[in-house]
């Protein structure tokens, strides 16, 4: 969307804080149903981020595929599990949990360092100029294919990895 600067910045901060709060809800809610709804909220916030960056097709695909199908599938799977499995006593921290949290924290810190060291101003203008040039030369379906294989390759790969980890976690919970 082509919004004014302060409105665009406010929406980015608002959606970012909603994304962080929703992510914390996914991890911290003791009830898996609430966690699944919080995951749906996070995926909807990601879709709204795509709308703010003028990627309407990617936003629609995000809503239809991840919020509409995958999240509903997760909610159904959680609803069919026994409720008694949610409240079993277990050790809060094991060695694997400590190693996993250490790896996740190091990845998070490296991503924050990379984000802060990147010059985003040039990246944004380069992307907008490429979009203007591509709109004149090729059709919209070809533009979608080019954008999915170039500009939006990393977001789709990251989402697929996150989805894979979530499904492995769901299988591990279902086996117990």
Swiss-Prot record:
GO CC term, one of those recorded: chloroplast thylakoid membrane
Main location class: plastid
UniProt-listed InterPro entries: NAD(P)H-Q_Oxidoreduct_6 (IPR050290), NADH_UbQ/plastoQ_OxRdtase_su6 (IPR001457), Nuo/plastoQ_OxRdtase_6_NuoJ (IPR042106)
Domain of life: Eukaryota
UniProt GO MF annotations: NADH dehydrogenase (ubiquinone) activity; quinone binding
Gene: ndhG
Topology relative to the membrane: Multi-pass membrane protein
Keywords: Chloroplast, Membrane, NAD, NADP, Plastid, Plastoquinone, Quinone, Thylakoid, Translocase, Transmembrane, Transmembrane helix, Transport
Reactions it catalyzes: a plastoquinone + NADH + (n+1) H(+)(in) = a plastoquinol + NAD(+) + n H(+)(out); a plastoquinone + NADPH + (n+1) H(+)(in) = a plastoquinol + NADP(+) + n H(+)(out)
Name by which UniProt lists this protein: NAD(P)H-quinone oxidoreductase subunit 6, chloroplastic
Location within or outside the cell: Plastid, Chloroplast thylakoid membrane
Function: NDH shuttles electrons from NAD(P)H:plastoquinone, via FMN and iron-sulfur (Fe-S) centers, to quinones in the photosynthetic chain and possibly in a chloroplast respiratory chain. The immediate electron acceptor for the enzyme in this species is believed to be plastoquinone. Couples the redox reaction to proton translocation, and thus conserves the redox energy in a proton gradient.
